[in-house]
Amino acid sequence: MGDFLASIWWMIVSFSVLVTFHEFGHYWVARRCGVKVLRFSIGFGTPLWSRRSSSGTEFVIGAIPLGGYVKMLDEREADVTVAERNQAFNRKSVWQRIAIVAAGPLANLLLCMLLLWVLFVIGKQDYSATVGRAEHLAAQAGIHPGDRITAIDGRQVTSWSEASMLLTAAAMDRQNAVLSVIGPYGERSEHTLELSKLKQPFDERHVTALVGINWQFMLQPPIIAKIEPGSIAEGAIKPGDIVLAVDGQQTLSTEDLYNQIQKLGRDGHPGMIEIRRGEERLALELSPRKSAQGVWLLGVKTNPGPVPAFDSQQRYGVLAAVPLAIRETARMTADSLGMMKRIITGQASAKNISGPISIAKIANASAKRGVGWFIYFLSLLSLSLAIINLFPIPILDGGHLLYYAIELLKGSPLSTRAMAAGQYIGLALLAGLMGLAFYNDLLG
C-alpha cells in the first residue's frame, strides 16, 4: 500500500512540474503576442485554488492533477467585444499562432536541458558498467566477470544504464557492437558482441540478459522472505537466511536459485544448500519437490539481496555543464526519435509504449534512488512530453501546427468542418495510443 500511494504521489509531482512548464510556455508567448489569456489551469475539475491577476487571467489549481490548459480569448469559442478583438487568438497572424502553440513543447525541451544541467552540476549516483557474469554471446566475445565497459561503438559509457541503452539500440538495429573494456587489473581490450546472432523476435527490455551480461551490482545472494507451510524447507530454513550456494555452485541471484533448484530436481538427489544465518554459515541437505505444474520447489519465497553502494558519480562545473546538457538533450532526442521510428517500422515491439501505471512506478523508483535519479527521470519525461505533443495529430500541439502549415500553403485557414473532422480523427488515434499504453501497463 505504501508503494502504491508513493507511486501516485510522485506521478502527480512529476506531471504537475512538466505541465506547469508546458502551459507556461503557451501563456508567456501568448502574452508577448498580445493575446488575452482567460485562464491558466494546472489540473482539471473543481478549482482547489484560484487567483485573478491584474491582466484578467485566472490562475487555477484543479482537483484532478492529470494535465492542464491555457484558455485564450477566441472569437470561435465565445463572443468578444469590439474593444478586445485585437487580443483574440484567432485574430493573430499565422506565425504568431505557430509561436504560441510551439511554445509548450519548446518549454518542455528547455526544461529537459535545464534539468540535465542541474544533474551534471550535482552529479547522478549510479553503478559502473562492471560485468558480474558473462555467458552466451558475451562469453563468446571474450567478456569476463570483472570487466568494466568504458565505451560502446566509440561512445563513452560511465554507467550500466548507459551501456544497457546503447546495447539495446544496437540490437534493435540488428548491428554488432564493439565494446571497449578495462579488466580487473587495468588491462584494456576491445570485443565484438555479435548482437546480430540474437534470435528474432526478442524482448528489447532484456537485451543485456539475453546476450549473457549480468551486471555486478545486481548479483547479490537472495534473502529468504517466507517459508511455505508444510514445505520441505519448513523447520530447516528461516526467514532472513541468505542463500550462498547450492551443491557448491555460488548463488548470486533469485534466478540462480531457481535454476539450481530445477537442476537438483532433475538430477534426482538431495542437494547441499549453504546459507548464512546471522554470523553462522550452515549447510542443509534438502530435496526439492515437484509441483503439479512440473516445477521443482523448496517451498521458499525470496527477496533480492541488499544492493551495494553506488560506485559511479561525475560532477562538472556550472559553465562546463552547459554544453554537456545541450549535447545530452540532443542525444536523448535522437534516441527517442530512433525508438519511435523502430516501433512504427516494426523493428521494436509496441510493448515499449508505457502508460501512467508504468510511469508512476518509475517515478517512485527513481525518487527512492535519490535526487539525481529523479531529476534524470523528469528530464526524460519532459523530453517525451515535448516530442509527443509535436506529433501531427489533431488535438495535440503538433496537429494545430499542421493546420497552420496548411494555412500557410493555401493562403487561408482550414474550414471549420475540416478542423472538426481532424479533431475526431485525432481523438480516435490518441484513444488507441492510450489504450495500447494501458494494455502494456496491465501486462507488465
Swiss-Prot record:
Say yes or no: keyword Iron present.
no
EC number of this enzyme? 3.4.24.-
- Gene Ontology CC terms: plasma membrane
Q: Which is an annotated GO molecular function term of this record?
A: metalloendopeptidase activity
GO BP term, example: proteolysis
Q: What class of enzyme is it?
A: hydrolase
The membrane topology term of the UniProt record is: Multi-pass membrane protein
Tell me the residue numbers annotated for binding Zn(2+). H22, H26
Which residues are responsible for catalysis? E23
Q: Where is the PDZ domain?
A: 192-278
Family annotation (InterPro entries): PDZ (IPR001478), PDZ_6 (IPR041489), PDZ_sf (IPR036034), Pept_M50_Zn (IPR004387), Peptidase_M50 (IPR008915)
Q: Could you list the residue ranges that cross the membrane?
A: 98-120, 371-393, 418-440
Q: Which PROSITE patterns match?
A: PDZ, ZINC_PROTEASE
Compartment annotation: Cell inner membrane
Q: Which keywords belong to this entry?
A: Cell inner membrane, Cell membrane, Hydrolase, Membrane, Metal-binding, Metalloprotease, Protease, Transmembrane, Transmembrane helix, Zinc
Q: Which family does it belong to?
A: Belongs to the peptidase M50B family.
Would you tell me the protein name for this molecule? Putative zinc metalloprotease PD_0327
What organism is the protein native to? Xylella fastidiosa (strain Temecula1 / ATCC 700964)
